[in-house]
Each structure stands twice: as structure tokens, then as C-alpha cells.
Regions:
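Residue-identity detector for glutamine
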Residues: 6-7, 60, 156
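A residue-level signal for beta-strand positions that form part of recognition/binding surfaces
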Residues: 12, 102, 149
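Short, polar loop/linker segments at the starts of domains and inter-domain junctions
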Residues: 24-38, 115-129, 161-170
Length: 170
């Protein structure tokens, strides 16, 4: 087991946000493992999000069906939640299914360093904590323990048979 601050092979994406550059399209410079990647953006003319080089980045959330016991039963097609990732039909609108449509978020460590001029910052996002300046803010349970994932409902909550549910169309 690798503890906090110990080195391991992993990914550290970084970017600099320059407070000295007025043009928003030019404010960001990629650092570390992000160097050479292409930007993600919303293509409003086609109404399709363009992930650039970021589609398979470790921090991308994944839609899934989460069982009542807290285990992922299967992943959903990210472009069509009515299908499982294998292309078969999903249970997103099945109110008798013993689970909920949820978005799974992986553990992410963050570090923010103000630039020397005080006008910008270097921001790092990693899948591990390479030093004590990296913190995992989102994946902490009620006892202060880091968890590999956290989940959020995909759909607005509704009550079905006395249970709060995340089900499509309800």
C-alpha cells in the first residue's frame, strides 16, 4: 500500500491560469502530464461536447446503476443512458430495479499553487498524492476516510415504495 506523500507511478495533470493574460482562450497553459493534450470544449453549432484529449482522463465521471448495497451493478453508455455499456437495454426507468441511476466520481487529489506574481495559479489534478500539498476533498466519508468513488444521482430524486430513488421519467 502506498501512503500519502509516497511516490508511485500515476498521473498528474497540471495547468497554469495566468492572471496577466486578458484573452480567456489564451489564459491556460498545460503543465506536467497535460502537456500536448488538446482542449475540451462545447461545440454549440453541433450541440456535441468535444472532449479533445480528455475523454479517457482518469477523473472523468461514469454513469452507472448502483445497487441498494452500494455496489456498481453495471455501467451505462455515456452517450445513451437507456443502454448498458455493452449496448443492451438498461434499467434507468425500471422502478422495480433494486438500484439507482448514479454518476460515479473517482478519487482525485488537488493542489493549487499561486504564481510568484500573485496574479495566477498552477493547478494540479492527480490520481494519487505525490506530496503533502495534494488533498482529496471529495471522496471522504463521515469518519474522515478516503473512498475510491463517490456517487451522485443522475435524476431528480423521487419516492417509490417509501425509498428515495434516481429513476428516469419519475
Amino acid at each position: 500500500i502506498i501512503g500519502k506523500g509516497q511516490q508511485k507511478a500515476g498521473t498528474i495533470y497540471g495547468f497554469n491560469v495566468s492572471g496577466s493574460v486578458a484573452d480567456p482562450a489564451s489564459k491556460i497553459t498545460y503543465l506536467r502530464d497535460a502537456v500536448g493534450m488538446t482542449k475540451a470544449y462545447m461545440d454549440f453549432s453541433s450541440r456535441v461536447f468535444n472532449y479533445g484529449s480528455w475523454r479517457d482522463a482518469f477523473f472523468q465521471p461514469r454513469p452507472c446503476m448502483l445497487g441498494y448495497d452500494g455496489h456498481v451493478l453495471y455501467y451505462l453508455d455515456p452517450n445513451d443512458y437507456s443502454k448498458k455499456s455493452d449496448g443492451t437495454s438498461s434499467d434507468i426507468s425500471n422502478d422495480s430495479f433494486e438500484g439507482n441511476a448514479m454518476m460515479e466520481f473517482p478519487k482525485i487529489y488537488w493542489k493549487v499553487e499561486p504564481t510568484e506574481d500573485g496574479k495566477g495559479a498552477n493547478i494540479y489534478i492527480a490520481d494519487y498524492a505525490p506530496d503533502d500539498g495534494f488533498h482529496c476533498w471529495c471522496n471522504i466519508d463521515k469518519d474522515g476516510n478516503e473512498k475510491e468513488h463517490f456517487y451522485m444521482a443522475i435524476y431528480q430524486g423521487c419516492t417509490i415504495n417509501g425509498k428515495m430513488r434516481s429513476v428516469s421519467g419519475k
